[in-house]
């Protein structure tokens, strides 16, 4: 999609949403609520400003809804569960029509969502499923299992595992154990890689074996923190890669972890070139995209979160207007209480050779921003 087409599409979406929305809107600064009437208020709860993607997600959705004539309250919770709960309670007290929630801990929001239900406020889980509550009306996300599968298939192809090549040294990482998506990411990748671990074509020198269904949590990085991933990779390299032993591939579920892992590799003397480990990622964050261009990261799975925001804006509009909310998956996402109707968007693999065609020509980044 060209940049001009992308801009026109966004304008068209906003115009479509605005067609029957009459509420005035006020520009929201940082995380404060907008002023004006709350008759068409939409609450947006994002987990943190510390990751680039959540800043982009929140700003894009907020902008779309405001252009459509809705009043918004956009809140960031600094990755603190109690703070997010308080923010949601405050939003509910303002009588919103819909809450869009990207949760920090998908198991902690049951009581506050019960308050939302009693106030007749509809809830859309944004990208992260909210578990253990019957009061989640819809879920919008990318195909998270496919994200992991694409990472696993990339490793499989680049190492020639299907052709019987190996053994190779693998170090697996998983996302934060309190994020429901992390399990889908890991399982998607592990379903591809596990047979090669069992056959000995992939060896895990650190001993981080994944045998049971919940064992992925043993390699999880709490809060998706780059510095924690870096420290963990440092520990594995120092403890298990001595005497000339080298790591060949690192399964990283997202870019924030990959950033820390790349820093660890660099500090231990790994340099871009034929022997540099395969390193996966997700989100196409700016620093990681630059690392891909510099051969310090092999790939990223790009989830164009603008399209996620576009879809959620349509869902919000349908709810407010009493229309039919579009979903395309009514079977997969069981939150322990109910199967939540979901809309899944497709992720895309990005490598060095197609950064320009996929990320620049789509308008996601400018060439100048990437140094191209």
Describe the role of every protein-language-model region.
Residues 16-22:
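C-terminal motif of bacterial Sec signal peptides marking the signal peptidase cleavage site
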């Amino acid at each position: 999609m060209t940049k001009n087409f992308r801009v026109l599409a966004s304008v068209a979406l906003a115009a479509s949403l605005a067609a029957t929305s009459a509420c005035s809107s006020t520009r929201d600064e940082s995380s404060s609520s907008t002023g004006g009437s709350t008759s068409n208020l939409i609450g947006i709860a994002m987990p943190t400003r510390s990751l680039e993607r959540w800043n982009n997600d929140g700003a894009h959705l907020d902008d779309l809804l405001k252009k459509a004539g809705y009043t918004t309250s956009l809140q960031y919770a600094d990755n603190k569960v109690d703070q997010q709960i308080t923010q949601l309670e405050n939003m509910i007290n303002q009588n919103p029509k819909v809450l869009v929630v990207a949760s920090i801990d998908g198991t902690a929001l049951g009581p506050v969502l019960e308050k939302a239900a009693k106030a007749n406020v509809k809830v859309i889980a944004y990208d992260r499923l909210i578990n253990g509550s019957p009061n989640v009306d819809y879920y919008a996300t990318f195909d998270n299992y496919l994200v992991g599968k694409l990472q696993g298939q990339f490793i499989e192809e680049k190492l020639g595992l299907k052709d019987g090549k190996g053994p190779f040294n693998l170090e697996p990482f998983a996302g934060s154990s309190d994020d429901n998506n992390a399990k889908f990411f890991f399982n998607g990748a592990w379903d591809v890689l596990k047979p090669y671990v069992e056959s000995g074509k992939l060896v895990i020198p650190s001993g981080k074996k994944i045998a049971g269904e919940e064992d992925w949590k043993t390699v999880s990085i709490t809060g998706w923190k780059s510095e924690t991933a870096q420290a963990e990779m440092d520990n594995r390299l120092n403890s298990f890669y001595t005497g000339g032993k080298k790591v060949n591939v690192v399964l990283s579920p997202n870019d924030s972890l990959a950033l820390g892992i790349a820093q660890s590799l660099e500090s231990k003397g790994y340099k871009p070139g034929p022997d540099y480990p395969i390193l996966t990622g997700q989100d196409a964050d700016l620093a990681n995209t630059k690392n891909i261009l510099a051969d310090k990261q092999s790939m990223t799975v790009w989830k164009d979160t603008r399209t996620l925001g576009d879809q959620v804006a349509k869902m919000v509009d349908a709810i407010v207007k009493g229309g039919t909310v579009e979903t395309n998956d009514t079977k997969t996402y069981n939150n322990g209480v109910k199967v939540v109707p979901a809309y899944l968007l497709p992720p895309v693999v990005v490598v060095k050779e197609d950064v320009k065609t996929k990320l620049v020509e789509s308008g996601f980044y400018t060439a100048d921003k990437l140094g191209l």
